[in-house]
């Protein structure tokens, strides 16, 4: 496995913009004969951070997958063995984390094993005080292949209470249409002494 990347940042002479990043990163997985099994190359073109702390970005990527056996995408759509290469593009934004309310969103399109994949996501974070946190997130995926079409939703929410440095209650609720199930994880933590919970 090989991986690497690089980034260049500059600070334009503009009142609203703090910095602009452009970069590239990726990885390559090969077999023992150095034949490609998986490759992912991603370009930030660009990522802009404003003085307030908000960010917007545009990403372009190239991906290659070489499955040696047929398999099911998302457990439902048949993908034959072969050599697949596709492009993808994604744009998104995120508001500053310095405020009690933080929102973000993204939308992307890519090829996908001879077909296409569209993804739209959004998230919301509200922390009016250090002792309370609420988040909500949703992601929609559409996969279109010669063998069929699939829509999936993943929705999640967190509700956390931090009563003191030693006592907290964290809750995660999650639902996805692929499995059709709702999951709830709740954890109460009380540190009686350092290193013990």
PLM feature spans:
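Exposed, low-structure sequence patches enriched in small/polar residues
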Residues: 1-197
């Amino acid at each position: 496995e090989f991986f690497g990347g690089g980034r260049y940042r500059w600070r334009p002479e503009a009142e609203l913009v703090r910095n602009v990043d452009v970069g590239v990163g990726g990885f390559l997985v090969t077999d023992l004969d150095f034949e490609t099994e998986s490759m992912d190359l991603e370009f930030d073109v660009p990522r802009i951070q404003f003085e307030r702390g908000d960010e917007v970005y545009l990403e372009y990527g190239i991906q290659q997958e070489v499955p040696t056996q047929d398999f099911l995408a998302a457990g439902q759509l048949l993908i034959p063995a072969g050599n697949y290469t596709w492009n993808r593009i994604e744009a998104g934004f995120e508001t500053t984390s310095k405020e009690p309310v933080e929102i973000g969103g993204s939308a992307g399109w890519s090829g996908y094993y001879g077909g296409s994949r569209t993804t739209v996501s959004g998230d919301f974070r509200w922390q009016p005080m250090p002792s309370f946190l609420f988040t909500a997130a949703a992601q929609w995926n559409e996969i279109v292949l010669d063998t069929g079409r699939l829509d999936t939703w993943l929705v999640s929410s967190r509700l956390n209470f931090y009563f003191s440095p030693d006592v907290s209650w964290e809750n995660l609720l999650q639902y996805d249409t692929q499995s059709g199930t709702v999951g709830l994880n709740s954890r109460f933590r009380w540190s009686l002494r350092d290193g013990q919970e």
